[in-house]
Structure formats: structure tokens, C-alpha cells
Amino acid sequence: MLNANKSIIRLATYSIRNRIHHLRTLHSLNYINSRINIQDTNHIRPTCPCGSKQFMLESELDSALIEFLDNDDPFSDSEIKESDDLSKGQSHVYNGSPVTKNSILQIEKQQIQKSPRPTETNKRMQIRKDPDQNDNVDDDSLSSTFEFSDMDDDFMEALKAAEEITGNNTNCIKRTASTPLKKPIAKSMKNSSTPSKSAGKKYCKYIKTSSPSPSHYLIRESGSGVDILEGSPNKVQADNASPFRITSSFSSPSQIQNQGVGANPGPKSKAEQNVSSASQSSSPPMTVSQVRNPFKVPTQFRRNYSTRPITNQGSDTKKGNSHHTILLATQKPGVPFSNPSDRSYHKLEKTEGINEAQSEAKNVKPIILSNEQEYVLKQVLSGVSLFYTGSAGTGKSVLLRSIIKSLRDKYPKGVAVTASTGLAACNIGGITLHSFAGFGLGQGKVENLIKKIKRNKKAFTRWRETRVLIIDEISMVDGHLLNKLNEIAKNLRRNNRPFGGIQLVACGDFYQLPPVVKKTAHDGTELDDVEVFFAFESSAWKETIQRTITLKEIFRQKGDQRFINMLNNLRDGNVPDDTARDFCRLSRPLKCPEGIVPSELYATRYEVDMANSRKLNTIQGDVVVYNSVDTGILPEPQKTQVLTNFLAPQVLNLKVGAQVMCIKNFDDQLVNGTLGKVIDFVDRDTYMKSESKENPSTETSDEVSGLNDYIFNDFQKPKKVVKEDAPIAEQVLFTGQLSQKVEEESESSKRKSKLKDDLMKDYKNKKYPLVKFLLPDGITFRTVVVEPEQWTTEDEDGTVLVSRIQFPLILAWSLSIHKSQGQTLSKVVVDMKKIFENGQAYVALSRAVSRAGLQVLNFNRSKVASHRKVIEFYKNLSSHEKESRSGQQRLNFMQTSVKSVARAQI
């Protein structure tokens, strides 16, 4: 710390001392300048003031001045010492007399009275570069002008800023290394003959054209020179290299590459030059010599120091909004996708262990959470047990992924991620709530369930070590089950606090699908008029949930405000006349690209199966049947029930020309819900070899791995290099694990290897489907060889309770409303004829991105219904939020009033 403070003061003081040397010399130079006219680079023709006599100035004076100023470099050493030639007693000869400091001062005194006051024309000494002698110096480094006015004030301001930093913010100033500045190898300007690799102009693109106050500039030592940094006594940003940041105008690593800023800039192609010139037309970048810097040496005599950006800044994130998550392309309908031909200008920065082809294929773009999402995240991280809700498309799942990542960073162990259904659990990389509890279906009395859990050592340990329990799709969790979980947690953890001291984070929308009502008693008898019991009705909810937050901002239908209003009018079941008319107008057929038809949503699974079978039978050709491989340790009745929650079918029938849907997220464009068409069935190895033969000249080892990236294989060895700040969906893609664990060579790895062998035996003589997917922009297609994937329900130790291996495809002419919950569909047809459940109409209609991608058949407002308990719950919730906001406003007003009174008294 002390060395860093001394370094700043030492550099500032040393620069001032050398600046004084320059100023002392300038009076002599002014006298010489009044007699000298530099007309070309080869001959110097001095002239007497009277203009009557010309003579050649001796070369000794020329070399003495240049050598003196060249050695007098404020950055040549990190120590304050007399290192120049004159301070060592060395002298130069001028007209037969040695030139020393004293002689220069004497010349100065003699000419002060004789020399006229410098004018604007003679304030600058022009020196032109000899191209034969100075090939290793940039044109911009040898500026044609030397401004010495106002420099003393700049130095004093810089020194004052350094003193304020050392006095007030000593804790913020850190040096990662004590490496002193290395003195660059001095090369004589006359003896330099080696051409420089960096000839031509170097633009400081990272330096703002509107330069801030000189007092905000500081310098940083580096192995290759001095970096110009921008700092402030009141705002200092710490990074791995320096407590200050480089003044920059870029915002992301990709933009850095687009602007051509790098450690080793090379020659640009014509296309790149055109792009660069177009981006610079509005405000031309400043050259190195044009940047005002209070510590700079006169540019015509200084060495070519490097001023380069800090390359270890991985991303540009705003302070306080560092929690990244992903925004799928289906939620950005208005954003055009980049043209593949433009990839040469938009290459991502390479990361260790991730090749460039993979980076382009796995283009998962991070976003910043909204203010309300950020507020929820902060409440969760502070330990508050809460429930957050919102209408369809408000980013509940996006926020949940960010919450999971942040909690796992805070608690490496003890974060249980669960959901009410297997499908919802797969979407967030978790397990079902029943699997977490370890009591099977959860039927029976609490005492018996506790005994069952205690016999299961893993389940018992899981209950004892859990710190945070996350439940997604809480709307489908029965209230009686939540009460049982609360009692079990208190008993197993021997803690009478709510949920035994476990923090509870619940997410969902009760206006969507309700819990499944059990219409049979424990003895098997049929029950009539069984009313649903929601989670918010349970005593566990009232005891545990401390805060409820409603998300207001909608992302899925963003840009179609009328459609947002139409969907909001459906939530409580009271459909206005104008909203009903708007939905009736959506009965027109949709326009889709050739070969793709909209997916139809039906209320029952029977309708879905019949519609898909009819469509498949109309296609000529042979049917290719893929049977799933199902395993697990659960007994058969429970295993079968859990498998029904998986979106992957037990039997998948495909033909060439069949419309399918991808049911896994692979990047921000090829996501769960992307429609495609089977164009062929190919052998995987043969297809890869044929692709390699088509492009033999351009294929490299990196491109081979990039091609593997387009082939979805959950059984490839998990990649151990994962970006630290990667979103959850991106980590799942890299590791191939839904549970997001990079497994070592353990029993779990051996188990998965055995599953792979079993799968390959079943698919031994079968080919893989080649699918042409329509990306969410509605224009771009991507052709992919699809390989089998694995869906598992596991406990925290990795033991597979239930597993299914199947291709991540389903026939997509028709889907059930139940399985469409949580998905985003670009083209969808909703037939409301057989809708029977509360919330079904709202779930089905809200899957669409916009009205342009939605067709509604048989719209009937009587089919739109919401449960009265849910309506009452949200009504009370809304009034409670209003009271909280008004109370907070009153509190803020009181605090402001108290502060005003205190100021008045002072």
C-alpha cells in the first residue's frame, strides 16, 4: 500500500522535475528558433535576425540538444535519480566549449532580456521526421507541434489529485505487483533502421474523444510501458491489475473485437477498414499524440510507449446489476439475427477451453435483470422466505435461474432446487418436490412419512443439510402436501421455526393450472366434489412466507401491448366485450414458412395423440420407431407416474417430413419449443465424414469439436472448463448435466456409461434424425443431427430415481395445454372447444409471443374461468402491496422531513 502511494507521488514529482528542465531549455530554444528556419529534413538553414547572412549550424549543437532531451525522459526509470547525461558530468561541445547545465542557464540569463516575448507563431518548434532515419517511430508519436503553455497548471492539478488519493483513499489503492518500470532500450534516432511492425497510425479507440479533466488521469506501470488510466479520488474501481480503469467507450468483449482493439493490432482487410471508417465517421478517434496527458513527454522527443486496454475485463456489467441470466430468442421477436456472412466482423473472444466454433454455436447472451427482478434477488440473498409471482411472460423462470446461481455461489451446498412436476424440474435443472422429500407420493400420516425418511439415510441427511428450498410452479403444489413438508422439516431438523429454519423460495402463478385433485381416498373409494386446496391456504404458507412480490414487467409479449392487455383481462375470468371480439378476430389462418405448420394446443392428451397420428399417417414413407430406455430405483407404480411427467415420449414415431419440436434448450436460438421438420435419417459417423470431405481445406481440430457441438450428445465427457459467470442454461449445455454437476470417475459416471451402452444396443441398427429447425426469428433455419438425450430425476447424491433416454423431439402438430405450460411458442393454434379446467384457457393463449403468431378457434368466454379463491388471493395481495407502498412513501416523507429539520437547526 505504501509503495503504491510513494509510486504515484514519485512519478508526479519526477515528471515535474523533468518538466522544469524542459522549460529551462526552452528560453534557449526560443532564441535559436528566432534565428533558425527549418525548411526541410535534410538541411538546416539558420538565419541572422537581420536576414543578411546565412550559415550552417554546427551538427554538435543539434546532436547535443536532441541527445539531452532524449535522455531526459521522466518515465525512463522508476527511481528519482540523476540519470541523464548532463547530471553525470558528461558534456557536449558547442563552438569548442562544453555544454553543461550551468552553461545553458548562463545562455538563458543572457538571452532573457534580448529575446522578445514569444508569439503564437514561435511558441512551437517544428521538427520533421527523416523517413530514412526514424522508421521505428510512428508518425503520430512524432507530433509536429509541442504545446508548452498551461502545462505547469496541469502538473499541479495532477499532483494535487495524487495527494488527495493518497490522503483520503489509501485503502482503495492496491498494486498487484511491485515490478518497477523498466527503462526501455534507448535507440538513437539516427541509427534506427529496422522498420516497425506497427507503422502507420495507431488509434486509441478506447479513449473518449471528450477528454475529462487532466486531474483524473493517472498512470499504471506495466511491463511494456505506461498505461494511461482514469481515476477519481471519490470513485476508484479495483480490478486484478490496477485500482483504476482505462477510459473506455466499449461495453463488451465482442464489441472490443468488433472495434479492432487488441494487444497485437495487425493490418486490416478492405472490408474491415470500411466497417472501421463507417463507425468512426461521426466522431473520429484520437491518436496517441492528440490525447491530453499531464504526464506526457514532448511528443516529438518521447519514446513510443504502449497505451492499451486492460484485457482481463470479461464483461461490461453495471454496478449493482451483476446477476446475469439468459433471454431466449423467442422472447425477443423483434430482434433480427446476425447474418452468417458477417461472422468475420463479430467473432467472440476466445476463452480457455472453449474454442471459437463452440462460442458461436452456444451463443447464450446474458442480460441484466430488471429493477423488480433485482429487488427479488436481493431479498432472497438476504435470507427472506418469500413468494414471487407474475402473469405469464414476466420472466419468472429467468429470474429463478439467476436466484439459483446466486444462491449456489453463496451456499455451495444446501440449496435444494425442486418443482411440482418433472417437466418443470427439468426446465430449471432440479428434481421433483416428492423426490427431494424422499417419501414417495407423500400419502399417509406425517408420523409414518417421517419414519420412512429416517430409514433413507440420504433423504434424512438431505433434510438436515438443506439451507434453502426452492419450489417452482407452486400453483400445482397441494396445500396439504405443503403442511406435511413443514411438519417433517421441524421434526427431522429438531427446530420449531417455520420449515425447521429452512429458507423457502416459492415461484409460480396461481392463475395458471391448479393442483391435481385426488378423487380417491386412502382406502381406494371414490370421492365426489373434492375441492382444490391451494398452497396459499395452508398453515405452512401463512407461517413461513414473509413477503410476497408481484412482477409487473412483461417480456414474452413485449412490443404488443394490446395483446398484453387482452391476456390480463383473461386472468380473473371476466372477459370484456372488446377483448372477446379481439380474440374472435384471431380465428384467421396463420402464415408460416413452407413446410412448417403452427402447433395446435388441446385440453386432453387423447386429442393430442389423435391429431398427431392423423397428420403422420398422411405422410408417405416408412415410420421410424424409437423406444425410450427407462431406468430407476423407484418401484414400478411410482416410477410410471413420474415418467408420465416427462415431456419425452416413451415411443417416438417419426417420418421424413414429420413436424417435430425441440424439447431441450441448447442455446439462445435453438430452445425448448423450437419447431422443425425431419428431412432425413442419417448415420452419425457417416454424416460427419461427409461433412468433413465437403470442406477439407477449412476443417481444423477446433472445427471438428464445433461440429460436435451441433450434435447433441449428453454422453460426451463433461467439459470441466466452464465460464465462472456463465448462465445456468449455458452451464447445463457445457456439462451435459441437468443437475449441473461435473462428475468425476465415480459410481454415477459408471452408471451413465452403462446406460449409454444399453441405449446403443437398442439403437444399434437405427439412424439418427436430421432435422431442419426454424429459428424464432421466423426466417433462419438450422439443420441439426439430433442424438439421444437423458432426462433424470435424481437426489442430491446423484442417485437416479427415474431416468428416460430418448431423442429430444416430439411430434409438434399438436400439444397438450398441460405440457405447454412454461413454454414459448412462435406459432400456435388454440382450440377452446374442450377446455374444462380453471386456468387452461389463460395458459394456452399466453404461450404465444404475439397476436401475429396466434390462431384461436371456437373462442367462448364461458371457457375462460379462474378459481374464486385465486381471485380473492390476488385481490388481497394487490391491496396489501398498495398499503406497503403507501406506508413506505409515508416513511420516506417522514425521514426527509426529519433531515430537513436537522439541517435547519444546524
UniProtKB/Swiss-Prot annotation:
Matching CDD domains = DEXSc_Pif1_like, SF1_C_RecD
Comp. bias regions, Polar residues? 88-119, 234-261
The ranges the UniProt entry gives for DNA binding are 840-859
**Chief localisation class:** nucleus
Q: Please list the reactions this protein catalyses.
A: Couples ATP hydrolysis with the unwinding of duplex DNA at the replication fork by translocating in the 5'-3' direction. This creates two antiparallel DNA single strands (ssDNA). The leading ssDNA polymer is the template for DNA polymerase III holoenzyme which synthesizes a continuous strand; ATP + H2O = ADP + phosphate + H(+)
Cited function: DNA-dependent ATPase and 5'-3' DNA helicase required for the maintenance of both mitochondrial and nuclear genome stability. Efficiently unwinds G-quadruplex (G4) DNA structures and forked RNA-DNA hybrids. Resolves G4 structures, preventing replication pausing and double-strand breaks (DSBs) at G4 motifs. Involved in the maintenance of telomeric DNA. Inhibits telomere elongation, de novo telomere formation and telomere addition to DSBs via catalytic inhibition of telomerase. Reduces the processivity of telomerase by displacing active telomerase from DNA ends.
Q: Where is this region: Disordered?
A: 77-146, 229-297
- The species this protein was found in: Candida albicans (strain SC5314 / ATCC MYA-2876) (Yeast)
Note the subunit structure: Monomer. Interacts with telomerase.
Is DNA-binding one of the keywords? yes
Q: What class of enzyme is it?
A: isomerase
Q: Where in the cell is it found?
A: Nucleus; Mitochondrion
Q: Which SUPFAM superfamilies match?
A: P-loop containing nucleoside triphosphate hydrolases
| InterPro entries, per database record | AAA+_ATPase, DNA_helicase_pif1-like_DEAD, P-loop_NTPase, Pif1-like_2B_dom, PIF1_helicase, PIF1_RRM3_pfh1
Q: What is this protein called?
A: ATP-dependent DNA helicase PIF1
Keywords in alphabetical order:
ATP-binding, DNA damage, DNA recombination, DNA repair, DNA-binding, Helicase, Hydrolase, Isomerase, Mitochondrion, Nucleotide-binding, Nucleus
* Family per similarity comment: Belongs to the helicase family. PIF1 subfamily.
Choose one Gene Ontology CC annotation of this protein and give it: nuclear replication fork
Q: Where is the composition biased (Basic and acidic residues)?
A: 78-87, 120-132
